[in-house]
Amino acid sequence: MAKKVIANIKLQIKAGKATPSPPIGPALGQHGVNIMEFCKAYNALTQSQEGMVIPVVITVYADRSFSFVTKTPPAAVLLKQAAKIAKGAGDPKRDKVGTVSAAQVREIADLKYKDLNAVNIEGAIKIIEGTARSMGIEISG
């Protein structure tokens, strides 16, 4: 018989930097999960992606055990990194804060494809292009 799931917790944590402080501690503590055990496992798994924000889905079971799945970094974070900017535009229709090439967009779409709700890679590229436009990033080429 399968374990009974009592909660699914979604967090975005910097890779290799999970600590018991908020937001991780309170989110896991209210379900009785061993916070340090999660932090050590998460940091070990995401050590190679240092500095990136990695979304994680934590499944908490009735016996207070847990499992977690990491996702690919958010498209906005990857686009900011590709355009070498700190943050998106406050008014994306008027202000353009950076530029990415079509090749960079395709590379990001390839990386994000498994987490996106897209039928094919062209659909994934359109999703990434839309995210870039909403951030005030222009796509060249």
Swiss-Prot record:
Family: Belongs to the universal ribosomal protein uL11 family.
Assembly, per entry: Part of the ribosomal stalk of the 50S ribosomal subunit. Interacts with L10 and the large rRNA to form the base of the stalk. L10 forms an elongated spine to which L12 dimers bind in a sequential fashion forming a multimeric L10(L12)X complex.
GO CC annotation: cytosolic large ribosomal subunit
Pfam families registered for this protein in UniProt: Ribosomal_L11, Ribosomal_L11_N
GO biological process: translation
Top-rank lineage group of the source organism: Bacteria
GO molecular function: large ribosomal subunit rRNA binding; structural constituent of ribosome
General function of this protein: Forms part of the ribosomal stalk which helps the ribosome interact with GTP-bound translation factors.
Post-translational note: One or more lysine residues are methylated.
SUPFAM superfamilies with a match to the protein in the record: Ribosomal L11/L12e N-terminal domain, Ribosomal protein L11, C-terminal domain
Source organism: Syntrophus aciditrophicus (strain SB)
Name under which the protein is recorded: Large ribosomal subunit protein uL11
Keywords: Methylation, Ribonucleoprotein, Ribosomal protein, RNA-binding, rRNA-binding
Entry-linked InterPro entries: Ribosomal_uL11, Ribosomal_uL11_bac-typ, Ribosomal_uL11_C, Ribosomal_uL11_C_sf, Ribosomal_uL11_CS, Ribosomal_uL11_N, Ribosomal_uL11_N_sf
RNA-binding recorded as keyword: yes
